[in-house]
Amino acid sequence: MEKETSKKYEAAVAAFIKENKPKGTVVYDDLANQLATPYTLDAEAMEKLIQKVEDAGISVVDENGDPSEHSLKKDEKEAEKAQAEDLSAPTGVKINDPVRMYLKEIGRVQLLTAAEEVELALKIEEGDQEAKQRLAEANLRLVVSIAKRYVGRGMQFLDLIQEGNMGLMKAVEKFDYRKGFKFSTYATWWIRQAITRAIADQARTIRIPVHMVETINKLIRIQRQLLQDLGREPTPEEIGAEMDLPTEKVREILKIAQEPVSLETPIGEEDDSHLGDFIEDQDATSPAEHAAYELLKEQLEDVLDTLTDREENVLRLRFGLDDGRTRTLEEVGKVFGVTRERIRQIEAKALRKLRHPSRSKQLKDFLE
C-alpha cells in the first residue's frame, strides 16, 4: 500500500471505529464493504483490521447479531482449551462450601460429542426444553473456565459465573449447528460478551462504556509488560508508542482507569480509623480561629449590653448578628413601627457609642 493510500486508509479506519464505538458491534459485511474492498486488503491485512476493531471494543458480528465466522474461528482453540481446564478456584480466590459443591457437581456432567450437540440442537428447534437444559448443563464448566480469566476486575467470582451462565443461555437459544462450529466455540463468544458487559456495568461506582473497559484492560496489560521489560514504571509516551496511541489519549485513559476509594476504608492494623479521618476539611476553621471567634462573640455581647435595648436590637437586625441575615432600614423600621429615617438615626447613634475608646478598645485586638 502506497504511503498516501496508507494515510487515507488509517484515517478511514479511525473514522469507522469512532462511528461504531457507541454501538459496540459492527456487521462483518459492513467492515468488508467499507474498508476491505475499497483498499483491497488481503487475508492478513483483514485479520489485522478485525483485531484493531475488536481491540477498540467493537464486536464483529454477522447480519443477525451473532458472532461472525471469523470470530468463531478465533474462538475454536480458546473453547477447546477452556473445556479441558480443571474446575478449581482461581488462585487467591476463597470459595465457600455451596460454590465448591456447585463446581464439583458440574464437573460430573459428561461433555457432549459433536453428533450429540447436533441432535440436541434439532430438538431445541422443535421446542424441546429438556434438550436446552442438557446442552446448557454440559457446558457449565466452560463458563467457569472463562469466568476465571476475569477475576480481579471488580466482580466476585460467583457473580462472574452467574453472568457467564446468562450468556450461555443466550447461546443455547441462538445456536445454529449448520455453521459447522461446535457449540462450545459458539458459546465462548456469548459467555465472554456477557461477562465483559457485566464488568463494565457493575464493577465500577462510575460506569464506564464496554469499549473503554476493554481499552483500559489492554493498557494495563501493556503497562505490566513494560514494567517487567524496563524494570520501572513506563511513561505515558512509552505506553502510547506500544499501543499506537497519542500520549494525551494515554493520559486520558489512565485518568479514567482510576478507581474511586471509599472514605470508609479502614486504616491501621486494628481498623479503628478510616480514610475519611485523614482528609483535611478545607472549609473548616482551625481550633485557634474557632477559639478567637468565640471570644469575639463574648466581647461583642458585653459591648452591646452597654447600649439601650432598642439600639442593641437595631444593630442585631441591621447586621444579622443573630441569624446571619442583614435587614434593610425599611425592614427594621417595620419591626419597630417607625420610619426608616428613625432607624438610620438610632443606628448612627449606636455606632458612635461603639466607637468610643471605652468600648472599641475591647474589640480592637480582634482586628489585628
UniProtKB/Swiss-Prot annotation:
Q: Which residues bind DNA?
A: 329-348
What main location does UniProt list?
Answer: cytoplasm
Ranges for region Disordered: 60-86
Outline the segment boundaries, as ranges, of region: Sigma-70 factor domain-4. Answer: 303-356
User: Where is the region Sigma-70 factor domain-3?
Assistant: 214-290
Task: Name the Pfam families on file.
Answer: Sigma70_r1_1, Sigma70_r1_2, Sigma70_r2, Sigma70_r3, Sigma70_r4
Write out the GO biological process terms.
Answer: DNA-templated transcription initiation
Extract the Gene3D superfamilies matched here.
Answer: RNA Polymerase Primary Sigma Factor, Sigma-70 factor, region 1.1, Winged helix-like DNA-binding domain superfamily/Winged helix DNA-binding domain
Q: What is this protein called?
A: RNA polymerase sigma factor SigA
